[in-house]
Swiss-Prot record:
GO terms for biological process: translation. InterPro entries: Ribosomal_uL14, Ribosomal_uL14_bac-type, Ribosomal_uL14_CS, Ribosomal_uL14_sf. CDD domains: Ribosomal_uL14 (cd00337). It is found in: Plastid, Chloroplast. GO terms for molecular function: large ribosomal subunit rRNA binding; structural constituent of ribosome. Belongs to the universal ribosomal protein uL14 family. It comes from Morus indica. Pfam families: Ribosomal_L14 (PF00238). The lineage of its organism: Eukaryota, Viridiplantae, Streptophyta, Embryophyta, Tracheophyta. Keywords: Chloroplast, Plastid, Ribonucleoprotein, Ribosomal protein, RNA-binding, rRNA-binding. This is Large ribosomal subunit protein uL14c. Binds to 23S rRNA.
Amino acid sequence: MIQPQTHLNVADNSGARKLMCIRIIGASNRRYAKIGDVVVAVIKEAIPNTPLERSEVIRAVIVRTCKELKRDNGMIIRYDDNAAVVIDQERNPKGTRIFGAIARELRQLNFTKIVSLAPEVL
C-alpha cells in the first residue's frame, strides 16, 4: 500500500534512484495506491549527469509493493520492496531498461512497453 510520503525505489535507468509519493492519480481522495496505479512523485535521490534532477516532480507507475497482491486464482504475490517506473505524459517509460520482476497485471492496464522491457514477469 503506497500512500503520500511513502519512499519508493526506482526500477529503471531513467536517472532517478529514490522517489517520494506525493499524490495518487485517479479518484479525488484515494488513500492507497497498488500495483499498476499512477502516482505523482518527487525525486529524492538522482544519479549525477542525467536528465532527471533531484526535487523534480514526475509521474510514475507502481510495479512492486510489499503489500500482498491477491489474484483471482488464489495466488498471493509479495515483493521485498516498493518500486516504481518513471513515465511520461503518454504513459511510456522514460528509461530504456527495467530492473527486477514486475507483476503480470500491468499488461491488462496497458503498460505493455514496461512489460516488454522487464526481465521477469510474475
